[in-house]
């Protein structure tokens, strides 16, 4: 295996970045591809009570263990397998078990704040920002948090107004300037997805040719 292609897919909560990342994953399944979610790298909170964990600001950069994420990305790019954490959103903490991720030719990194950390950003071959209207994002977040994370409507709306929206404006939206590609309307933008897939394929081919010549 040559040097992997690392694609970063960022964007606000509910922007459709996960849909974009999964679509790219689907398109490259014939090649060697893996996906890493930044959400898996929320910090371990075993030392906190359940009440204290619930008060954590999960939309702030400090909520993530970027040192571990960086180390794991570097290991994957060096051809080494990693043990990826598994995060349980219902108890706001990591699960005891981990999942092994093997090195692949294409690595898709997905998360709202992956472009905020310069160390991680500099590893990427292509930086993508999924840009979606705030009204659409909050509607998607409400559905997701209620159906997938066991939250109440009141708690989701309160968190959005007090935490999610301010953090988006302060930390997530500004990272758009680092993006090589900005995709409006997320996974529904077929033209952007097709162009991005073609570009990734070209980079992968170039890296494979370089490796063969070395």
Swiss-Prot record:
SUPFAM superfamilies from the UniProt entry: P-loop containing nucleoside triphosphate hydrolases
Gene name linked to the record: udk
Protein name as it appears in the record: Uridine kinase
Spans traversing the lipid bilayer: none
Catalytic activity: uridine + ATP = UMP + ADP + H(+); cytidine + ATP = CMP + ADP + H(+)
PANTHER family, sorted: URIDINE KINASE
GO biological process terms on file: CTP salvage; UMP salvage
Cystine crosslinks: none
GO molecular function terms listed in the Swiss-Prot or TrEMBL record: ATP binding; cytidine kinase activity; uridine kinase activity
Pathway: Pyrimidine metabolism; CTP biosynthesis via salvage pathway; CTP from cytidine: step 1/3; Pyrimidine metabolism; UMP biosynthesis via salvage pathway; UMP from uridine: step 1/1
InterPro entries assigned: P-loop_NTPase, PRK/URK, Uridine_kinase, Uridine_kinase-like
Cytoplasm as UniProt keyword: yes
Binding site for ATP: 11-18
